[in-house]
Amino acid sequence: MDRVASQIYSGALPYITTMDMEDRLRNRIAAKAGAKFFKACFEAVVADKSGLFVLSGGAATACHIGDDRNVLKCLDFDYYNATQEWLQLARLQQRLQACVQDNLEILSRLAQSVRMQDDLFVVKCFQNGAFCFNGPVQARLVPCVETVRTSFNGEFDLLRFALQVELKALNGVDEYVDQKVIVDRGAAVFNVFFVNIRAMKGPLTMERCVRTLAVFGDAYRVVVSPLQSVINDQIMCLLKDIFTDKPEFRVARPKALICALFAKLPREAYDECINSHHGAEPTRRRDETVTSFCRRTLHIHGPALGCRKLVYAYFKTDSFARQMPDYVANRAIYPHTDCEMKWKEFIHFFVVAKV
């Protein structure tokens, strides 16, 4: 694996990461599954009555800007529980499995239609390993819903439900694990996440609102995160897209959504002066990651003032100096060390867009 890593660093070996692979499979499969599939998944989730499910992410954005053409790639929820009951994961997985079975034909057809380059090399994120696909690659849907649980942080635990796609190559798949090579392991399996649930560890303290999710119907009303929270989430998505080297057209999408969401903000959201620091300038704490600092600043001040606080911190403090977001800093053999240009792109958007 050391030899492979040196080839990647030198630019001699074209590659894609496992996270990028899963993202592209989601664009080819989940994003084309249709509103019927996601409506069934939505109703399967909210059928659990143990707590409150608040819609967030891309679907919440579509609700706030009134977009009935928005293509859903996944459903994101914040789950709040104030009772003695807890989320029934096994039953929820069974209901989502039924949704997949009802749409299995179209999902399988979408998986089989995925085309990739020959001799594909896929680097594992957060591990010292990789897959090497020898020859033409074929994709097949595994009709079982996978549940992935992660104790994420003190704020929430993350529950994710995924379709699984098996990738095979004509001449086999080799796997690199540390300094070993497993020759012709048969196939590699990748997750296509279509439902994400943040199980919040605290009580619901923010406002919530009811909006129409037009992609499910003109009168389909859902509980969604408030506008300012949705804007904050989209800003953090933009940061991730920039640092994970998404293509320019992919980065342009969250920028357009952020501008559309900002246009919905009330005028009073812009009234507070940027120089009012409430006794403390916006500065990253020593024990705080740069992504946590951005998220905290936006949460405390709201998106309108929060963005201006981040611009202030970029030019007036060293909060962003030599800082890499954790979702790329912790990747094994991540080849990019100069993050200054990416921070410039992120901050430049707030300046030019005048959000």
From Swiss-Prot:
Database matches in InterPro entries: AcMNPV_AC18
A Pfam family it matches: AcMNPV_Orf18
Keywords assigned: Early protein
Domain of life: Viruses
Its biological purpose: This protein is required for viral late gene expression.
UniProt name for this protein: Putative early 40.3 kDa protein
Source organism (scientific name): Orgyia pseudotsugata multicapsid polyhedrosis virus (OpMNPV)
Taxonomic path: Viruses, Viruses incertae sedis, Naldaviricetes, Lefavirales, Baculoviridae
